A protein has these predicted regions:
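Solvent-exposed soluble domains appended to multi-pass membrane proteins
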Residues: 2-178
Length: 178
């Protein structure tokens, strides 16, 4: 529990728009696996445990990989970080994405704002880049947006305002609270 609500605007939007929750099959890592499951609809529990990362071990070796991007006239991927991790540049090609925007790609990340001392581009930056795509689309378009703002590792010096939100409740030690 936090002393202040860090996302009041999001909560307000949820009251006025269609929203919901998704139960993540992973926490604290495995981003590419969550992407794979979201884009294909295939849960990793249906695969052998010897296949820990489908992006690098399955998708890059198959000619056909069914996924949601194939259902749209245009598909764009945006990841405001490096594109090579988990073989995303190859995976998105095989999935049929028309363009992949990442740092260093021929399709440029236009907005590049960071928050405080974070080494990663902000969610605001990611959303602005995605909104540019929405504005340019003439027909239906699928956008796969993978953000980086809250990616580990980070410590208490990650943000300048780390004292704005204080964890409260039982079981929180002084190290965590401070």
């Amino acid at each position: 529990q936090l002393s202040n609500d860090p996302i009041p605007y999001i909560r307000q939007l949820k009251q006025k728009t269609t929203s919901g929750t998704m139960i993540s099959a992973g926490y604290g890592g495995g981003t590419a696996n969550m992407e794979y499951m979201s884009l294909t609809g295939f849960n990793l529990s249906n695969f052998s445990p010897t296949l820990p990362t489908p992006y690098t071990q399955l998708v890059t070796h198959r000619k056909y990989n069914p996924n949601i991007a194939q259902s749209f006239p245009e598909a764009v991927a945006i990841h405001p970080y490096q594109g090579v991790y988990y073989s995303r540049t190859e995976v998105y090609k095989r999935f049929g994405f028309d363009r992949f925007y990442y740092l260093g790609s021929k399709y440029k990340i236009k907005y590049k704002k960071k928050i405080d001392r974070s080494p990663y581009l902000s969610d605001e930056t990611a959303y602005k880049n995605a909104l540019d795509q929405v504005k340019q689309a003439n027909n239906g378009e699928f956008i796969n947006l993978v953000t980086m703002q809250n990616h580990f590792p980070y410590d208490r010096n990650y943000y300048n305002n780390s004292d704005k939100y204080t964890p409260v409740g039982e079981g929180i030690d002084d190290y965590t609270r401070n």
